[in-house]
C-alpha cells in the first residue's frame, strides 16, 4: 500500500485469518487500531504476532454491544469482520449477521464516522 494512512480504525471481529491479514496491512500503514474480539486475553497473542503494535484489544460479545460505542470515539472508520459459521444454542447467528451490522450503522451515523465497511 505505502500510503501511510495515519488513521484510527475500529475492527470488529478481527481475530481470524482475514482479520490478521487486515491488521498487518493497517499496521504497515501506521494506523491506530481498536480491535474488538470475543477472545479473552487476545492482546497477548497480538503482541506475539505483531511486536510493538499499535492495537488496543477489547473483549466484547453480542450481549454487550455498548462496549463498542463506548470505545469508538474519534475513529475514522469501522470495519466489520465479525461472523459465525453456524447457529448455536443461543440463536446468535441471526443477531451477529443482522443486528450487529445494523447497530454499527446506527453508531456510525450518531458519531459521524464516515466510513463503515
What are these regions (language model features)?
Residues 10, 32-34, 56, 117:
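A structural signal for isolated positions on well-ordered beta-strands in alpha/beta enzyme cores
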Residues 42-54:
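Short, conserved SAM-binding/catalytic segment
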Amino acid at each position: 500500500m505505502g500510503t501511510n494512512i495515519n488513521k484510527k480504525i475500529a475492527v470488529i471481529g478481527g481475530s481470524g485469518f482475514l482479520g490478521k491479514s487486515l491488521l498487518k496491512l493497517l499496521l504497515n500503514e501506521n494506523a491506530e487500531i481498536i480491535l474488538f474480539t470475543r477472545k479473552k486475553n487476545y492482546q497477548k497473542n497480538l503482541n506475539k504476532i505483531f511486536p510493538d503494535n499499535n492495537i488496543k484489544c477489547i473483549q466484547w460479545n453480542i450481549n454487550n454491544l455498548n462496549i463498542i460505542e463506548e470505545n469508538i470515539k474519534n475513529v475514522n472508520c469501522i470495519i466489520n469482520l465479525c461472523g459465525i459459521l453456524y447457529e448455536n444454542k443461543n440463536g446468535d447467528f441471526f443477531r451477529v449477521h443482522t443486528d450487529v451490522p445494523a447497530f454499527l450503522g446506527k453508531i456510525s451515523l450518531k458519531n459521524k464516522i464516515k466510513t463503515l465497511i
